[in-house]
A protein has these predicted regions:
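Catalytic-loop motifs flanking and including active-site residues across diverse enzymes
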Residues: 26, 56, 108, 168, ...
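Extracellular/periplasmic periplasmic-binding protein-like sensory domains
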Residues: 13, 116-192, 266-270
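Extracytoplasmic ligand/sensor domains, especially the bilobed periplasmic-binding protein
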Residues: 1-76, 125-151
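Sec-exported extracytoplasmic/periplasmic mature domains
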Residues: 35-40, 61-69, 90-97, 114-121, ...
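Structural motif
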Residues: 26-29, 77-91
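Segments of small-molecule ligand-sensing domains
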Residues: 178-191, 201-260
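Periplasmic-binding protein-like
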Residues: 1, 42-47, 96-106, 112, ...
Length: 273
């Protein structure tokens, strides 16, 4: 699945449920982080002119609420057909923003990081987890230029030594060794797929002997505090009849010395409204 908010629409699509946190959820969490850590922020939003980018802008405004027009000093969209987005970054720097929300796909996210370094523009920089690949984004942009960029995550990184003694990660590793020997454990899709499959197993367990389409869907919408082995500790899966968004929590992370480091508490996307 993608992070499109359309996956969480039980009224119009009662048989469809995504898995990963939606773009709107991640944007809400970024907005909460900004309000807590930089309450007088002047935010520049750089986003793709498509559903992905627009979902993000909506999520930011969900949390900023009535203050959105004063907090967000610039909204700049780009087309995915553009060869370079440098002119957009120059324009956004000129707004005097001290927070930059980078809602760009990998190619353009890397361009943004690189151009910001050239301009010596150093706002608080929050970047969508769509573009957190070290190989596809941070290295092409320059590791030094990428230093300090913020994002948020929900999955453990199998290649990160901090999880080597983690019980959940040990189960994942033994599964991969048994069924996929030689697989590249640094591929985040393996960790993601394992968590999604483990959640599906939980749904089937809850379904018991009643494996009708209706009951399986009912159980998928009745998950309570399920913790898959490869989710970051503290992040739980919860669904309901009117809530088809399994993961609505993230943990902030910072790019430091060539790798992502988790920090702070788990942040929920709940807005209370």
């Amino acid at each position: 699945a993608t992070g499109a908010s359309k996956w969480n629409d039980p009224k119009d699509f009662p048989w469809t449920m995504g898995f990963q946190p939606s773009y709107r959820v991640e944007a809400r969490i970024f907005a909460k982080y900004i309000l807590k850590n930089k309450p007088d922020a002047k935010v520049a939003v750089f986003y793709a002119n498509d559903d992905f980018g627009k979902d993000y802008v909506t999520g930011l405004k969900d949390v900023f609420g009535d203050k959105a027009s004063s907090i967000i000093v610039a909204e700049e969209s780009y087309e995915t057909t553009e060869p370079s987005i440098d002119s957009h970054i120059v324009k956004l720097k000129g707004t005097g923003a001290d927070v930059f929300v980078n809602i760009a796909t990998p190619k353009f996210a890397a361009q943004a990081i690189k151009k910001m370094a050239e301009l010596e523009w150093k706002p608080m920089h929050l970047m969508t987890d769509v573009s957190i690949s070290i190989g596809a984004v941070m290295k092409p942009a320059g590791l030094e230029a990428s230093e300090g960029v913020l994002s948020a995550g929900y999955l453990k990184d199998a290649s990160d030594p901090q999880w080597k003694d983690d019980e959940g990660m040990k189960k994942f590793m033994s599964f991969v060794d048994k069924y996929m020997p030689g697989a590249n454990i640094s591929d985040a899709n393996l960790v993601y797929g394992y968590a999604a499959a483990q959640t599906m197993v939980q749904v089937l367990k809850q379904s018991g002997d009643n494996l009708t389409r209706e009951n399986v869907m009912k159980q998928a919408a009745s998950l309570k505090d399920f913790a898959a082995d490869t989710l970051i500790p503290g992040i739980k899966i919860n669904t309901g009849a009117n809530d088809f968004a399994p993961i609505e929590q993230l943990k902030m992370m910072r790019f430091k010395s060539g790798q992502w480091e988790l920090f702070g508490d788990i942040i929920s996307a709940e807005t209370g409204g």
